[in-house]
Amino acid sequence: MERIKELRDLMSQSRTREILTKTTVDHMAIIKKYTSGRQEKNPALRMKWMMAMKYPITADKRIIEMIPERNEQGQTLWSKTNDAGSDRVMVSPLAVTWWNRNGPATGTVHYPKVYKTYFEKVERLKHGTFGPVHFRNQVKIRRRVDINPGHADLSAKEAQDVIMEVVFPNEVGARTLTSESQLTITKEKKEELQDCKIAPLMVAYMLERELVRKTRFLPVAGGTSSVYIEVLHLTQGTCWEQMYTPGGEVRNDDVDQSLVIAARNIVRRATVSADPLASLLEMCHSTQIGGIRMVDILRQNPTEEQAVDICKAAMGLRISSSFSFGGFTFKRTSGSSVKKEEEVLTGNLQTLKIRVHEGYEEFTMVGRRATAILRKATRRLIQLIVSGRDEQSIAEAIIVAMVFSQEDCMIKAVRGDLNFVNRANQRLNPMHQLLRHFQKDAKVLFQNWGIELIDNVMGMIGILPDMTPSTEMSLRGVRVSKMGVDEYSSTERVVVSIDRFLRVRDQRGNVLLSPEEVSETQGTEKLTITYSSSMMWEINGPESVLVNTYQWIIRNWETVKIQWSQDPTMLYNKMEFEPFQSLIPKAARGQYSGFVRTLFQQMRDVLGTFDTVQIIKLLPFTAAPPEQSRMQFSSLTVNVRGSGMRILVRGNSPVFNYNKATKRLTVLGKDAGALTEDPDEGTAGVESAVLRGFLILGKEDKRYGPALSINELSNLAKGEKANVLIGQGDVVLVMKRKRDSSILTDSQTATKRIRMP
């Protein structure tokens, strides 16, 4: 109070007022603070006092010719005095108004294209629906979210090159446009922005918004996709939330969502193959999401999800250093430990070998629906503070933390044997055995854990073994908090290694991820996922396997037919026939394989019996190890549409129908492609072109006269024989075919016959 009174007295003296208003500020530190750097230190104040001046704006000199000195009301629009320190003109805000009303009208066609992200946002909001407002405590946790709907996923460098090429094509400087997306975007934008009059800098800013993912670390309680984040300020406050359904989806959210689904499907499928890592890479490289190669998306997309990270690790990309256990992301925030192998006995007296973490450590655990802070010592949980959306989510987090703590009472709570296996029928490691066991039923675990009296701490309550809240008692060391635990904010990425069973380790050898951590949740992808790999054919069921197998044979017929005659065993062992085996009744696989292989051998031995359609139809049945038996089949059974359907060895059936007239094949009523009987000029070469329609009988036979040239062959009558010179000076005996129907691929028989002794 005293000070204020003193100030009032001072201010009443005119001298004080004079000092404060007239004296120059000459304290160097203050001058430095407000004048160093280009950054405005107090933008709001600056704006206020600038706008209070008569001419706060500067403009190019040309403005004088374009704007009158005074407007209709006689107010001055620009000053004759130059802007100090530049040759620009000082202009009044009224000039802007005059220009907006009377200035030249320009085409508006480019505005929606340049400001595309804004126009799209308006549309989403217009069609979005806002529901009721609910007042309740919001458990928000900070997550790294995408704040920029509708962007491509280019890196900053890639985007910079595209922007320079589109906006400043004549500027000097090396620009490398290599990725498919860069080239497509550049071409598209150049066309869209022809004759665009909008300031290049503005266009560049807007392009950046469209091309680059911008993320922020924000407190979120609900949806984290970018179309929710753009209305975060409308949908959640400190004590309220408003329901909202976006009025449209954006491609970047769809890419994120579809990428997760594709990665999960691929990891699950790779796990059960003979070489999981090789299979995973093959699938990643041959899959497209929304028409873009999955490997390109993986390189650019920062989504952190277990399956996605396994795929990234396989490609040699860096990933986050946090590790995953029980579907929670663990990040060590302090402490350290060493790992020692230890043998422990379960409540069922089964011996488990576990890697014990010795030492004090603190972790944050972040899951989709619950988060926690965990403090632990060697095989002992010291404290767990959990928060979650509901009882179920909180229970999930508690189970994971209890198992992770490796406490003896947890291991002793196991009832029955632990024999969980993964998709490939391999036993899970002990920690995951325990986790699966208690995820199925945690009653004994919670009952045996122990309870304690609790102190009354603000924002914390206890939780009882039956998962009900309490203010007096709680599971030992466990508390439930109203506040969430923030996700790990760092975007740091580390180099990792991956073994052939898809276990991902950091450079110290700690396992960060393994296929056990990949969620089994099934979703429907927003964008079309095209798995070109035969390993993924079965994802859409038996029919898809059938159609895809035959389509593959037809697409690769040129190479398949050469292998069929020259190296059948290699052909039979092709991985593309693997998925088909699951359609053949188990008991019949070996018999069918033996039967068809024998049939094919006869075709190769007996001249003129080569039948393209039949080979295509029966080829997938040769993949199983053959059983030698005298059995003959007129039809082969495949299990599709919930029952056994027959493929006729000779002739058409609903499963496999070849239309001679159109030369098209339909499998289960679906078009599987056309059989092009004309050989590819480039591949089969002259011999096959010549020998089409001729049967090769063997080596040259002098009785049939001198070798004819290729052109002279056409004069032969059906059934007539002649010697002919082919290829590298070989002479063979041929006969012109009597029937046209068998003119299928004599060329292969040709190459075989030439080799005859």
UniProtKB/Swiss-Prot annotation:
Subcellular location as annotated: Virion; Host nucleus
Coiled coil: none
Keyword Transit peptide annotated: no
Name of the protein this chain belongs to: Polymerase basic protein 2
The keyword Hydrolase belongs to this UniProt entry's keyword annotation: no
Lineage: Viruses, Riboviria, Orthornavirae, Negarnaviricota, Polyploviricotina
Family assignment from sequence similarity: Belongs to the influenza viruses PB2 family.
Subunit-level organization: Influenza RNA polymerase is composed of three subunits: PB1, PB2 and PA. Interacts (via N-terminus) with PB1 (via C-terminus). Interacts with nucleoprotein NP (via N-terminus).
Gene Ontology CC entries for this record: host cell nucleus; virion component
Protein's job: Plays an essential role in transcription initiation and cap-stealing mechanism, in which cellular capped pre-mRNAs are used to generate primers for viral transcription. Recognizes and binds the 7-methylguanosine-containing cap of the target pre-RNA which is subsequently cleaved after 10-13 nucleotides by the viral protein PA. Plays a role in the initiation of the viral genome replication and modulates the activity of the ribonucleoprotein (RNP) complex.
Pfam families on file: Flu_PB2_1st, Flu_PB2_2nd, Flu_PB2_3rd, Flu_PB2_4th, Flu_PB2_5th, Flu_PB2_6th, Flu_PB2_7th
Entry keyword set: Cap snatching, Eukaryotic host gene expression shutoff by virus, Eukaryotic host transcription shutoff by virus, Host gene expression shutoff by virus, Host nucleus, Host-virus interaction, Inhibition of host RNA polymerase II by virus, mRNA capping, mRNA processing, Viral transcription, Virion
GO biological process: one example: 7-methylguanosine mRNA capping
Principal cellular location given in the protein's record: virion
Motif Nuclear localization signal, residue numbers: 736-739
Site (Avian adaptation): 627
Database matches in Gene3D superfamilies: Polymerase Basic Protein 2, C-terminal domain (3.30.30.90)
Gene Ontology molecular function: RNA binding
Annotated source species: Influenza A virus (strain A/Chicken/Hong Kong/37.4/2002 H5N1 genotype X2)
